A protein has these predicted regions:
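Adenine nucleotide phosphate-binding catalytic loops in nucleotide-utilizing enzymes
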Residues: 99, 123, 129-137, 150-151, ...
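Phosphate-binding loop of NTP-binding sites
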Residues: 1-154, 160-171
């Protein structure tokens, strides 16, 4: 500070140097961010999409596929920029903790996602947030930066998230639920096996079956 050397926060640097021209898929929420981010990045790579990612933990990879082993050997991967086949996707664990000692905004405010997955929203980080409303304000700031041609994906019947969206949102929303708890959600899941390794996914009039070995 005394030498007036230019500095920036990690989230701002990431946004300006990596995310600016990517289709950012941000996974936010109080719980489950690391797991959901890993699952989303894995699904994209399994589908042949060379998505970049930043995960808040090193993934445990159980595969013989060398391509997947290399990509998931660390918690971050740059991925490919936009190509003829797909946008340059980047999956990021979007943390609500503050950005730096000089920038008390949540990290995810910098990321400007096109798609946001909001897992849940509860009171957390009592060292920097006085109450749930303060966290909701930060989520509101992120939501307002998601474009109208983007998407918000969130669980149905989550009061704290619904309250946040009522403050202002111009992005289409997909609500998800287990079919037995909310048959009116946009996306529904129905367990076929109780351990979660096999389930059905319903959207509109379409049904797909998922066989998932990472339950």
């Amino acid at each position: 500070l005394n030498e007036r050397i230019p500095y920036t926060s990690g989230p701002q640097f990431l946004a300006e140097q990596v995310l600016q021209y990517r289709h950012v898929l941000a996974v936010a929420g109080t719980h489950g961010k690391t797991t959901t981010t890993t699952m989303l990045a894995w699904i994209l790579h399994y589908a042949g999409i060379d998505a970049g990612f930043l995960i808040g933990g090193v993934p445990l990879v159980d595969t013989q596929d060398e391509r997947l082993q290399q990509a998931f050997a660390h918690s971050s991967y740059l991925g490919s920029d936009k190509t003829a086949n797909h946008e340059g996707y980047f999956v990021i664990e979007a943390d609500e903790y503050d950005s730096a000692f000089f920038d008390k905004r949540s990290k995810f405010v910098h990321y400007r996602p096109t798609t946001a997955i909001l897992n849940n929203l509860e009171y957390d980080h009592a060292d920097i947030f006085p109450n749930l409303a303060a966290i909701q304000t930060q989520f509101h700031h992120m939501v307002r930066m998601i474009p109208s041609n983007g998407k918000i994906i969130m669980p149905a019947d989550t009061e704290s998230l619904e309250e946040t969206l009522k403050k202002g949102c111009w992005t289409p929303i997909w609500r998800t639920a287990i079919a037995s708890t909310n048959p009116h959600a946009d996306w529904q899941a129905k367990l076929v096996k109780q351990d979660g390794s096999q389930y059905e996914v319903m959207f509109d009039d379409h049904t797909g079956q998922v066989n998932w070995q990472m339950s």
